[in-house]
Each structure stands twice: as structure tokens, then as C-alpha cells.
Amino acid sequence: MSYTLPSLPYAYDALEPHFDKQTMEIHHTKHHQTYVNNANAALESLPEFANLPVEELITKLDQLPADKKTVLRNNAGGHANHSLFWKGLKKGTTLQGDLKAAIERDFGSVDNFKAEFEKAAASRFGSGWAWLVLKGDKLAVVSTANQDSPLMGEAISGASGFPIMGLDVWEHAYYLKFQNRRPDYIKEFWNVVNWDEAAARFAAKK
């Protein structure tokens, strides 16, 4: 089984004016496609791993041959992270229900959660991601470098937990529109969070 680039459930301009069409198209068809291609190439000689869903593969990095571990950490990680990212974007959804209640319980308020998430995203040096994760029965905000995922575990990524939502803070995710203004990009994210997807992921794991 080869990994394939997932189709987006919306047009490239669907998130305007918050996330621009050009960035979305390049990000999806160029950057994400490259992660898919590189992961598939690395897996050609690893048939015992090639049929695993990418979310499962990245939990087994310590089982990979040493010469494949880094390339798959980066590229299978990139494929998994971006696949989640695209599904997590949609205009016009509302934070409500069990997920909202859990955020208020674990962060004190929605505003406190947003402030903590924005800080994690803005302070991640270089390239990486900010995440809302479920650890056991508690929500937490974490960040990872490069294309690391919380699914890789603390020993590899420095974070753990089941991702509920994530924000890509690589420059390729925002530079065409926001240049070096990462905090502005992070603020715009709240206008396109797919809270329905986040709630579904939370409900599946709580």
C-alpha cells in the first residue's frame, strides 16, 4: 500500500480571507506531496511496515532500521500531520458541547486555552507544530519540532497524547501571506478551526 495525497474537503480559496488560496494550494500540492513521495520511497524496502496506516507507523519509529528512521520520522510524520491539519480547517464551526466543557475544565476558560495555544505556537523556535492533545482524560497544549507528532511519544518528539487539533507553524504554511508575522497567522487560525472535527476526535478517544 502506498500513501496518497488526500483530497481537500474544500476548495483552495475556501478559507479566504484568513488563509490564502496560493498558500493552501502550494502547501497541499507541493509540500505535502513531497512528504508522501519521500515516505513511499523509504518504505519500498520495508514491506512489513508499508501497509500500516501512517498514524500507526509513526508510533513504531523505534522498530525501524536505523537508516530509515529519520527519513520516515520526517516524511511519514509530515504526511500524518498535514492529513490531520487539512481536516481540522473549516470556516463557520463553533466550539460547543463536551469538548468546550473539557477545555473549560482543564484550562479554566476558552480564552485561557487560546492564550496557551498561541504561546506554544508562537514560541516554537524554527519549524514545528502546536497541538491540543488528550492525555489520559485530560486535555493539554504541547508543541513539537519539525514534523514530529505527539503520537511518536515523549522519547522521540518530546510530547505525547492523542492530537485533537494542530497548527502548522512552518514558514511555508504562512509566509506568502503573513511574511514573518507568525502571531498574525496564529490569530487567523481561530477563524478556520474545524471545531466539529476536533469534537469528533475528542469524542472518539475520551
From Swiss-Prot:
Cross-referenced InterPro entries: Mn/Fe_SOD, Mn/Fe_SOD_BS, Mn/Fe_SOD_C, Mn/Fe_SOD_N, Mn/Fe_SOD_N_sf, SOD_C_sf
Binding site for Mn(2+): H27, H82, D168, H172
Obligatory cofactor(s): Mn(2+)
Free-text cofactor note: Binds 1 Mn(2+) ion per subunit.
Key words, A-Z: Manganese, Metal-binding, Oxidoreductase
One GO cellular component, as annotated: cytosol
Keyword Oxidoreductase listed: yes
A single BP term in Gene Ontology: cellular response to selenium ion
Catalytic activity: 2 superoxide + 2 H(+) = H2O2 + O2
GO MF terms, alphabetically ordered: antioxidant activity; DNA binding; manganese ion binding; metal ion binding; protein homodimerization activity; superoxide dismutase activity
Pfam families assigned to the protein according to its UniProt record, in alphabetical order: Sod_Fe_C, Sod_Fe_N
Protein EC: 1.15.1.1
Keyword Metal-binding: yes
Top-rank taxon: Bacteria
Family of the protein in this entry: Belongs to the iron/manganese superoxide dismutase family.
PANTHER family: 37S RIBOSOMAL PROTEIN S26, MITOCHONDRIAL (PTHR43595), SMALL RIBOSOMAL SUBUNIT PROTEIN MS42 (PTHR43595:SF2)
Assembly and binders: Homodimer.
Function: Destroys superoxide anion radicals which are normally produced within the cells and which are toxic to biological systems.
Stored NCBIfam families: PRK10925.1 (NF008177)
Name the UniProt record assigns to this protein: Superoxide dismutase [Mn]
